Amino acid sequence: NVDVLIADANETARDRAMEVADVAGIHPDQALAELSRFSCVVTSPGWRPDTPLLRAAQAAGLEVLGDVELCYRLDRASVFGPPRTWMVVTGTNGKTTTTSMLASIMQHAGYQAEAVGNIGVSVAEAVSAPQRIDVLVAELSSFQLHWSSQLVPDVGVLLNLAEDHIDWHGSMAAYAAAKAKVLAAPLAIAGLDDALVQQY
């Protein structure tokens, strides 16, 4: 029971999203001017942390979270049935290959598993799919992990770290810290042949 508004500067994209989701939409500048209307902001991973709307929302004490974080919370709250197993793969290189291999291994082991996130279907589609997916093998980017404050996967894989997306994160340390969040998993797998990964 929440009121949802879509904010997008691209009018065509906003209109399309409004039609598909059957919700109202506004320009981000209007949302910025009317922040008091909102209780939280769910952001696209494409929006950088220094986006005026997101900075203002955080300064106003609003929670800013990503779509993956929202899906995780809904899943853990059993909104779509019993919580799923989350296996999250990240790193600078090799994410897609590793995620695909891991999903295939889980499928061959008899699990209803699917590669999701940045490959395959979105996490939102996966958790709400009519045919239940029990194991989400998710390839997640540093952008998605940045906006994930409560996401603790059942299995977390950090393959490697190299300088990437510094313009988005602001520093190598911030980029690496976002990636390293997956190591909070009860079962964490790290590429320890990588000197940067060893620091986490």
Please identify what each model-predicted range represents.
Residues 2-17:
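NAD(P)-binding Rossmann-fold cofactor-contacting core
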Residues 9, 27, 45:
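Residue immediately C-terminal to the conserved phosphorylatable aspartate in receiver
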Residues 18, 32-36, 45-192, 196-200:
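Phosphate-binding loop of NTP-binding sites
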Residues 22-29:
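Conserved SAM-binding strand-loop segment of SAM-dependent methyltransferases
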